[in-house]
Regions:
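Intrinsic-disorder/low-complexity signal
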Residues: 1-220
Length: 220
């Protein structure tokens, strides 16, 4: 059965296999990656281990497994082993690099013997797409086709689903160099001209690039 965006189909099997294909057009320099998010009733992951991707290929209990390949991936879901707090599993494809979804010549998901879905790629500017989802409904499981684009790459998508993404440590700020003239002007305006003369003298003698400690006795 060929699904259209928004359509769903019941899943009768206890274990399903999903095959994704995303061959790229000529000149495509990015790298498509399949990412899965095991979501609770609030649409968020309950922990970072519920984020299945190239660095974490299976869920802790082994209910969801991801196998990645060149411009393709396969997913195996043991529906009867999915934790009770997981309401749905979002199936996404993210482009790593400067390219977008429009750089793919095909973007499809197939459940052999059940259904398949092909998402539109032409003219799309998004770097990520929610291709479909496997979700609970009245005590059973269903597969829904989506093809919903998402602006941004993997990081904003993961954050949207509640993944705690590590941020790079900020670079320490360089200490500000205090202007001697400003300090003197605040405390003793009479010494401003002295500081200016000292600066001119250092420049003439090519010593202005050297740093040295100096002390001024300010007679209040």
């Amino acid at each position: 059965m060929n699904l259209q965006s928004g359509q769903n189909i019941p899943l009768q099997q206890s274990t399903i296999r999903l095959n994704l294909q995303y061959p790229a057009k000529s000149g495509f320099k990015g790298e498509p990656d399949t990412c899965l998010f095991m979501l609770n009733a609030q649409g968020k992951v309950s922990g970072d281990s519920d984020f299945i991707f190239y660095n974490n290929l299976s869920s802790p209990e082994g209910a969801v497994r991801l196998v990645t390949g060149s411009q393709q991936a396969s997913i195996e879901i043991a529906l009867d082993r999915v934790p009770a707090n997981v309401s749905k599993i979002a199936i996404t494809v993210v482009i790593d690099g400067e390219d977008t979804i429009s750089g793919l010549s095909l973007l499809s998901i197939q459940a052999p013997g059940i259904a398949d879905f092909q998402a539109e790629t032409q003219g799309r500017s998004e770097k990520a797409i929610i291709l479909g989802e496997v979700y609970r409904h009245n005590g059973a499981w269903k597969l829904r086709a989506l093809g919903q684009g998402f602006n941004g790459g993997l990081e904003p998508l993961a954050i949207n689903y509640g993944v705690d993404v590590a941020q790079p440590a900020p670079q320490p700020a360089k200490p500000a160099r205090i202007s001697l003239e400003k300090k003197l002007e605040t405390r003793s305006p009479r010494l401003v001209s002295l500081a200016k003369k000292a600066s001119v003298s250092l420049t003439k003698n090519k010593l202005d690039t050297l740093e040295a400690a100096a002390a001024f006795v300010l007679d209040a």
